[in-house]
């Protein structure tokens, strides 16, 4: 699927990919939902995958809120940057090892809605014009929104499909 280029496409892809993800998950048996992926090195189950998505939603939500309120903050919290962010993902994984699957699902569903609500408040121009906001650096707000939602859901879909295929 092509990367969204406007607000309508972004909202549509984010919603469709999220719905596909949740349908795929909901069609697993209870045992399969709690099963271990035989192939991942970091995210080892559905809970880990959902917690990862939730944490990236939080990055987007907090970054947008702070910057739109005049508090200049980078997308990735210190001490992380785009060279070492895999270390941050490991910290997210560690943080959620005691999170229940049910909590991970609930958090993800809410944070998904929160992201959509944020996206809704912006125009196409505000979302997809590079450097429209100085706090987006050389890219656009929409690019960050795509990364936090639709493209990340695509990754999660591929991960859980791969897991489902391994069950056969």
Spell out what each predicted region is.
Residues 83-128:
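Acidic/histidine-rich alpha-helical segments that form the ligand environment
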Residues 36-87, 121, 127-168:
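Short, contiguous alpha-helical
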Residues 3-7, 93-98, 138-142:
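A short, mixed-charge helix-start or loop-turn motif at secondary-structure junctions
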Residues 10, 38, 93, 104, ...:
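Generic anion/oxyanion-binding catalytic loop in active/binding sites
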